[in-house]
C-alpha cells in the first residue's frame, strides 16, 4: 500500500491546492483497492478475477482519468451552498456523466470505476460544501452530507414501475436490493458503522495495512447486498458469497500472510461461479479514503 506523504501545514494554503490534495487521496484509494491482492473474484495484481473484459492496467488508466475530475465535484459542492442539499445531486449528474465519459475513453469502453465515480463524486462534493461552510471535514460529516444530497433517490429511481426496467430497478423489485443508491442515501452505514471502525481497530492493533484491508473487504462482502454479485449469481450466489466471507471471518479472518491461502481459494471459487463483489470493492475504496481524510490539513 502506498504511504501518504506528509502534507503542508501552511495556514494560507489555497482551496485549489486543498482540492488537489483530496483528489489525490481519492486517486490513491482507487489504486490501493485494485492493487490489493488477492481479492475474491476481483481484478488485482494476480489475475482478473471473474472478469474477462478488464485488467489491472484498465483500472490504473481509469483512476488517472477520474483523478482530474474530482476537484470539479468539490468546486461544485462549494459553489452551491445556498441550495438545499437535496437539490445538489441534479447539478452533480452532468459532472458524473462527463467523468464517466473520460473513464470510458481511458479504458476503450470498459466500465472499471462507475460505482466509484458515484461515491467519490458525492463525497468530493460534500468536501467542497463543508469546506465552504467552514464545517468539520470528517468521515461522519462527509457521509451525512452525501446522504442529504441523495435524499429520496431510492424512491425516485428504483421504485418506479417502468416497462423497461434498469438492472438496478430489477434487482430492487426482485430482491429488495438498493445497491449504491441505497447505501449513499443512508449515509454509508456499512462503512461508518462496520468497515471503517473495523479497519481502524486492526491498524491500532498493529495489523499489516494490506492484511487489515483484506480482512475489511471480507467484512463488507459478508454484510453487503452487492448488486454486482446478485446480477451475476442471483440471490443464491449473493447468499453463498456472504456466508463464505462470514465463515472466513469467524475462522479468524486474515491475520497473517499464511491466511492468504484462504483468499486464493475463495478467489478461485468466485471465478468458477462468475461472481465479482464490485459493490464491496467500491465501499472498500470509500473506507480507505475516509480513513485517510485527516491526512489533509485544512
Swiss-Prot record:
Listed EC numbers: 2.4.2.52
Keyword Transcription regulation: no
GO biological process: prosthetic group biosynthetic process
Keywords: ATP-binding, Nucleotide-binding, Transferase
InterPro entries associated with the record: CitG, TriPribosyl-deP-CoA_syn_CitG
GO molecular function: ATP binding; triphosphoribosyl-dephospho-CoA synthase activity
Keyword DNA damage: no
Reactions performed catalytically: 3'-dephospho-CoA + ATP = 2'-(5''-triphospho-alpha-D-ribosyl)-3'-dephospho-CoA + adenine
Protein origin, superkingdom: Bacteria
HAMAP family: CitG
Similarity-based family: Belongs to the CitG/MdcB family.
Official protein name in the record: Probable 2-(5''-triphosphoribosyl)-3'-dephosphocoenzyme-A synthase 2
Amino acid at each position: 500500500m502506498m504511504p501518504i506523504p506528509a502534507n503542508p501545514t501552511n495556514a494560507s494554503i489555497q482551496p485549489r491546492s486543498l482540492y488537489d490534495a483530496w483528489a489525490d487521496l481519492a486517486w490513491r484509494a482507487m489504486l490501493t483497492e485494485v492493487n490489493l491482492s488477492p481479492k475474491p473474484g476481483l481484478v488485482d495484481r494476480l489475475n482478473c478475477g471473474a472478469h474477462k473484459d478488464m485488467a489491472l492496467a484498465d483500472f490504473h488508466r481509469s483512476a488517472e482519468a477520474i483523478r482530474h475530475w474530482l476537484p470539479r465535484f468539490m468546486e461544485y459542492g462549494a459553489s452551491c451552498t445556498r441550495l438545499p442539499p437535496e437539490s445538489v445531486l441534479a447539478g452533480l449528474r452532468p459532472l458524473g456523466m462527463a467523468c464517466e465519459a473520460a473513464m470510458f475513453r481511458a479504458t476503450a469502453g470498459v466500465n472499471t470505476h462507475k460505482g466509484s465515480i458515484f461515491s467519490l463524486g458525492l463525497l468530493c462534493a460534500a468536501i467542497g460544501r463543508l469546506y465552504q461552510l467552514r464545517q468539520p471535514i470528517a468521515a461522519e460529516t462527509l457521509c451525512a452530507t452525501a446522504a442529504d444530497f441523495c435524499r429520496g433517490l431510492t424512491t425516485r429511481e428504483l421504485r418506479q414501475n417502468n416497462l423497461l426496467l434498469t438492472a438496478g430497478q430489477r434487482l430492487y423489485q426482485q430482491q429488495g436490493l438498493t445497491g449504491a443508491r441505497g447505501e449513499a442515501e443512508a449515509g454509508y452505514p456499512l462503512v461508518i458503522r462496520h468497515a471503517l471502525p473495523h479497519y481502524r481497530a486492526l491498524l491500532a492493533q498493529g495489523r499489516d495495512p494490506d492484511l487489515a484491508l483484506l480482512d475489511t473487504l471480507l467484512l463488507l462482502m459478508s454484510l453487503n447486498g452487492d448488486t454486482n454479485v446478485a446480477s451475476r449469481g442471483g440471490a443464491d450466489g449473493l447468499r453463498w458469497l456472504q456466508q463464505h466471507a462470514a465463515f472466513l471471518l469467524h475462522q479468524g479472518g486474515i491475520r497473517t500472510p499464511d491466511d492468504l491461502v484462504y483468499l486464493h481459494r475463495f478467489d478461485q471459487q468466485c471465478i468458477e461461479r462468475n461472481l465479482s463483489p464490485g459493490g464491496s470493492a467500491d465501499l472498500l475504496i470509500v473506507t480507505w479514503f475516509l480513513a485517510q481524510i485527516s491526512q489533509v490539513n485544512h
